Curated annotation (Swiss-Prot):
Reaction(s) this enzyme catalyzes, per UniProt: N(7)-methyl-GTP + H2O = N(7)-methyl-GMP + diphosphate + H(+)
PANTHER family registered for this protein in UniProt: 7-METHYL-GTP PYROPHOSPHATASE, BIFUNCTIONAL DTTP/UTP PYROPHOSPHATASE/METHYLTRANSFERASE PROTEIN-RELATED
Designated name of the protein: 7-methyl-GTP pyrophosphatase
InterPro entries from the UniProt entry: ITPase-like_fam, Maf-like
EC number: 3.6.1.-
Main location: cytoplasm
Amino acid sequence: MPKLILASTSPWRRALLEKLQISFECAAPEVDETPHSDESPRQLVLRLAQEKAQSLASRYPDHLIIGSDQVCVLDGEITGKPLTEENARLQLRKASGNIVTFYTGLALFNSANGHLQTEVEPFDVHFRHLSEAEIDNYVRKEHPLHCAGSFKSEGFGITLFERLEGRDPNTLVGLPLIALCQMLRREGKNPLMG
């Protein structure tokens, strides 16, 4: 049975994959994440997830390698990590009363036989109307400076939303586990069977 590799150093993706109670290792993929000028958000995350998984194939032959990438889209524009409190407040002002869509690309690459499975999972976050005071307090309390969209849905960010829409809530954190389980089963690795 091939061993499992997560092509990521993200502690959030690691924590999500640990939910499946299967052994795996993490490795940093070497991929240029610069978007191509003609790529849609869906195309970007699909390409990057695939490249991340395949970039580790030579280091990990005979493995199942998981690649994942995510973008946050508001008003048709990709929204990155804010990195500063002012940028976080600006992103949250734009999101207030709007829908932010996350696209998460997922790839499972079998480096033993070259079989590749891919999927893009969308997830919509409906923001309620936020006051300036609410935005300021949220940024001060949560410090979401390294989170695309300037919030942590798994934390205090839940207070910002009217509703969430998507097939798998794990998608919002960065790894669609329902789709991944389906891919793993197709490779003969059922998480429920050890």
